[in-house]
Amino acid sequence: IEGDYSYRTLPASVLNIMRRYIPALILPDKKPIETENNFHFDMHIYNTELLSTVFQIPVKVYTHSTIKGYFNDKAQRLRVEGYFPRLRYENKFIESGMFLCENPGDQFHTRLRFSNRKSSGAVNIALEAQAQNNSIQTTLNWGNSSTVTYSGKLAAVAHFIREQKEANESKRKLPPLKTVIDVQPTNVILNDTLWDIHPSQVVLDSGKVYVNDFYFSHKDRHLRINGIVSPHPEDTVRLDLKEINIGYVFDIADLGVNFKGEATGPAFASGVLENPVMSTDLFIRNLGLNEGLLGDANIHGEWHHDVKGIYLDARSEE
């Protein structure tokens, strides 16, 4: 490390730079800290035993890794670039890890890429985000290398807004943060099947989450979500399913229970963030459990918050 730097003021320097791009999200300090960091660095990592033993950070680096870049408070510029060919975090093995943070122009740009190695194969992850004008555009790509394909792309733009709702409102009172997330149209592959994610919008405002027509489909099959997620019992979110394979959920969650079947029908949830009340009435075609076929079934389900359990009333036809 060469140059002028202070560990005490470095976090404030980073926030000062990022505030230029998303000022509605990162507010100024009540007591501004003077920062004069101007340095560059080139670090080579061979052994991380100190992190594990002294700081209790469960990281082990297996090969030569590097972190390099520069920081200039006066020019309001930074760049941090890291390469980690092979490491372990807790029980997760990471290969070909790379991250980059920089602001060469009118955007703050972040990129992260790695492979999560598992016994059944590897999952490749690539995340990219650009911040500018109180907005963050994020793209996530992933893909696996096992016999059954799970891969795809998620993309969204988050807009951060703080505005005075009333003309006579005190200027000293901080306006609440409102976040508008525009979900972009993309595709994902689940169990070798191509699904479409359609444009939709999610709004976070005053402690509530408004979901406006989230729509996920493959031909005639679909999942649609509308409603309000909040702590209040009068706010309800509705899910409409048509021939959705419930096996997707159990495959991804890896719960050790193998349910199969195609679900059609509505599901409702209210007061989700505090005392959730949930109910569903589904018709499941070819319901199966742990490789055994139970037949078609009509299922009424309820979440009982007092006992934190699920009540199911299922009637099946073989």
What spans do the regions from the language model cover?
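Interface amphipathic segments
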Residues: I1-E318
